[in-house]
Structure formats: C-alpha cells, structure tokens
Regions:
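Long, amphipathic alpha-helical stalk/connector segments used for oligomerization, subunit docking
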Residues: 110-113, 117-176
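Alpha-helix capping/hinge segments and adjacent helical runs
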Residues: 24, 46-124
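Charged, amphipathic alpha-helical oligomerization/scaffolding segments
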Residues: 10, 14-17, 54, 58-65, ...
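Short coil/turn segments at secondary-structure boundaries
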Residues: 22-24, 37-38, 74-77, 81-83, ...
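Short, small-residue-biased leader/transition segments that mark boundaries at the very start
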Residues: 2-7
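A generic secondary-structure signal for well-formed alpha-helical elements
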Residues: 15-33, 63-66, 70, 74, ...
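C-terminal helix-coil-helix/basic helical segment that borders enzyme active sites and/or dimer interfaces
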Residues: 16-56, 158-177
Length: 178
C-alpha cells in the first residue's frame, strides 16, 4: 500500500510540473505573437523554438513512465483489459513518435537551435535563469539550490556540445537524446 501511495504522489508531482511548464510555454507563445515590442516578440519566439522540442520529449517520455506506473499499481490486473490501463499504455506509446520522434527532435534542437550562430538563445535563457536565482526569497531557497545545480549541469553540457561541434559532430549526434 505504501509503494502505491509513493507512485501516486510521484505521478501527481510530474503531471503538475508538466502542467506548469505547459502554461509557461503557452504564455511565451502568446508573447511571441502579440507583444507590442518586436524585440520581445523575437526573443519569446526563439525561446519557444528552443523549449518546444524539450517539452515535447519530456512530456511524452514521462507520460510513458506515468502510464507504466499506473499499470504497476494494479499489478497483474493492470495488464488486462478490465482496468483500461493497458489501452492507455498502448495509446501513449505512440506519443514519442508523433510530430517527429524524440530522437529526431533532439538532433534538430542541438544542431539548429542550441548551437545557433545568428543568436545565442541558450545563453540568454541561462542568463534569465541566473537572474531568477538571484532572488533572496527564503521560501525559494531549497528550490533555488536544486535549480542552481541543474543549471550548472546544463551549462556544462552546453559547453561540451559547443566544443564537440567543432571537433566531431558524430559524438554530438550520439549524445543528442541524453
């Protein structure tokens, strides 16, 4: 019983995080289309372009994980047609393939958006996150520490990608889906 509660709480937190990210990306899309300042519209459009494949891949991969967890909650019965979870699992299995497989989206992200000579979208995004981290709000202290560690990983990976792009694009292609 305890394991089922842990799985359910994990599923709930993933879904709520995805929902918040979806709202944020939708807001950026609105800004990119309707803001009165051309520069702000362009920056929002670039941010949407950068984040859309990340969000698509994350949502579809985690959707598969959540559906699998839902099936596990029911044990052997989850695999049968009685509960309907098996149908959800089958229906969800196609989502990483729709609109370009997650692997193809990852290659496009890295080769066309992450290492973009015309505009350095990723660095502007990182700078905006650093600015958000500078908040001295004590309620966000634990969250900010975790975000800062994740940001360091993102910077390290981005620098690695940019360095490898100069030397071996095959290494970069192999790392795209990670």
């Amino acid at each position: 019983r305890q394991r089922q509660m842990c799985i359910r709480d994990s599923m709930k937190s993933i879904i709520e995080g995805e929902r918040a990210l979806c709202f944020w990306l939708s807001q950026q899309t609105e800004v990119s289309l309707y803001h009165s300042d051309e520069k702000i519209r362009r920056e929002a459009s670039e941010l949407v372009s950068l984040m859309t494949p990340v969000v698509k891949s994350m949502f579809t991969d985690l959707g598969m994980e959540i559906t699998s967890d839902a099936m596990q909650i029911f044990g052997g019965y989850g695999y049968t047609k009685d509960q309907g979870i098996e149908q959800l699992y089958r229906d969800n299995r196609i989502t990483p393939i729709y609109e370009g497989t997650n692997s193809v989206q990852a290659i496009d992200l890295v080769f066309r958006k992450l290492v973009n000579k015309e505009s350095d979208i990723i660095n502007r995004y990182i700078e905006s996150l650093k600015k958000d981290l500078s908040s001295k709000n004590q309620e966000l202290k634990n969250f900010n520490e975790k975000l800062e560690n994740s940001l360091k990983t993102l910077i390290k990976f981005t620098d690695w990608i940019k360095d490898k792009m100069q030397k071996s694009k095959n290494d970069v292609s192999a790392a795209c889906n990670d």
